[in-house]
């Protein structure tokens, strides 16, 4: 535990990665204020964070219901509290939905973030950890993905992340006192070991592990495997899956870097394990962890899906002193622990 009186604003802190990061911030002695509009999350998630950290630490957590697109919500928050840094998670993140409704994504992800920068600058809070994504690499020409690769998003969601990275670089270049870390996540999975926090998507899940989990608890009949003829070891696509608690610790490491490195500028880091697992390998690992058989439906490839993507983690290891600790076995164990305790997510009912 590191004592700290620093206060961190966490936008979208009621979401999957947000809640797990807030737990680690509180455990590391930070004071935390969450702002969230519950577009893709619920108040119960915030209550569970309080439960997980205990009554003492939960005194250091505040919550505000607000929307970054409404500048007044931010203005009230920054007028009331002095923030030392912002961790910015808030945003929509479903690739398919972004293709069908790009305007919603541009409004939510871009407008909200631009408002946030303006209010931060006005109140002289110029340190940010930004939640980016490996989607900014698009179809990488080679692997592993290294931070200085050419960036080329393939869909509106990915483009919002890419635009926001470019905006961050432009702001920092024009106003060098800003310190910004861009964290490019690969595929976050798993859950808090308590089984009280986890991913709870609305509707049909867009990501592999919540989908597998819903088949395991009987909410969905089978898993659609998109592509079984890729040139990989078992024909299914390969991705870099990372435990959400490793990801949360990556944010703590990034925050420490912001506070200690005057010359950080605007720097990007990959957060992954540096190892790829195929869809079918993840299914097998989950079956082993849960004792459940996952019914599969083999489907054609989805347009735009890459064959194999995984991270080079050398830069984060060297500059942030961070390295993923958990393997696929722990990811599936914790995912199943969350699923069996919360088959219907935070609502507890169909």
UniProtKB/Swiss-Prot annotation:
GO terms for molecular function: UDP-arabinose 4-epimerase activity; UDP-glucose 4-epimerase activity. It catalyses: UDP-alpha-D-glucose = UDP-alpha-D-galactose; UDP-beta-L-arabinopyranose = UDP-alpha-D-xylose. The keyword Isomerase applies. Its EC number is 5.1.3.2, 5.1.3.5. It is an enzyme of class 5 (isomerase). Keywords: Carbohydrate metabolism, Cell wall biogenesis/degradation, Galactose metabolism, Isomerase, NAD. The active site is at 157 (proton acceptor). Pfam families: GDP_Man_Dehyd. InterPro entries: NAD(P)-bd_dom, NAD(P)-bd_dom_sf, UDP_G4E. Optimum pH is 8.5-9.0. SUPFAM superfamilies: NAD(P)-binding Rossmann-fold domains. NAD(+) binds at residues 15-17, 36-40, 67-68, 89, 93, 161, 185. The keyword NAD applies. Optimum temperature is 30 degrees Celsius. Its cofactor is NAD(+). Pathway: Carbohydrate metabolism; galactose metabolism; Nucleotide-sugar biosynthesis; UDP-L-arabinose biosynthesis; UDP-L-arabinose from UDP-alpha-D-xylose: step 1/1; Cell wall biogenesis; cell wall polysaccharide biosynthesis. Inhibited by Hg(2+). Belongs to the NAD(P)-dependent epimerase/dehydratase family. This is Bifunctional UDP-glucose 4-epimerase and UDP-xylose 4-epimerase 1. The gene is UGE1.
């Amino acid at each position: 535990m590191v004592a700290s009186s620093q206060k961190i604003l966490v936008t979208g802190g009621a979401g999957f990665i947000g809640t797990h990061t807030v737990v680690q911030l509180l455990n590391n002695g930070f004071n935390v204020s969450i702002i969230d509009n519950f577009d893709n999350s619920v108040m119960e998630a915030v209550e569970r964070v309080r439960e997980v950290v205990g009554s003492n630490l939960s005194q250091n957590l505040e919550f505000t219901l607000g929307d970054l697109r409404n500048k007044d919500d931010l203005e009230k928050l920054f007028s009331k509290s002095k923030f030392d840094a912002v961790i910015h998670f808030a945003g929509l993140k479903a690739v398919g939905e972004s293709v069908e409704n790009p305007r919603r994504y541009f409004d939510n992800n871009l407008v909200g973030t631009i408002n946030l920068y303006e209010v931060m600058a006005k109140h002289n809070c110029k340190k940010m950890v930004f939640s980016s994504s490996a989607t900014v690499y698009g179809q990488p020409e080679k692997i592993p993905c290294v931070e200085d690769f050419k960036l080329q998003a393939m869909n509106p969601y990915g483009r919002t992340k890419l635009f926001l990275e470019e905006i961050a670089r432009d702001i920092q270049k024009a106003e060098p006192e800003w310190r910004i870390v861009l964290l490019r996540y690969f595929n976050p999975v798993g859950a808090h070991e308590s089984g009280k926090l986890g991913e709870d998507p609305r509707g049909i899940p867009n990501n592999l592990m919540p989908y597998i989990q819903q088949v395991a608890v009987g909410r969905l009949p089978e898993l659609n495997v998109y592509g079984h003829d890729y040139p990989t070891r078992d024909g299914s696509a390969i991705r870099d899956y990372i435990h959400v608690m490793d990801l949360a610790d990556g944010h703590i490491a990034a925050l420490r870097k912001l506070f200690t490195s005057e010359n950080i500028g605007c720097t990007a880091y990959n957060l992954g394990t540096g190892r790829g697992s195929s869809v079918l390998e993840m299914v097998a690992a989950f079956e082993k962890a849960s004792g459940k058989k996952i019914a599969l439906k083999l489907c054609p490839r989805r347009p735009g899906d890459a064959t194999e993507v995984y991270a080079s983690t050398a830069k984060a290891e060297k500059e942030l002193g961070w390295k993923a600790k958990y393997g696929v076995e722990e990811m599936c164990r914790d995912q199943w622990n969350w699923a069996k305790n919360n088959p219907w997510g935070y609502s507890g009912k169909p």
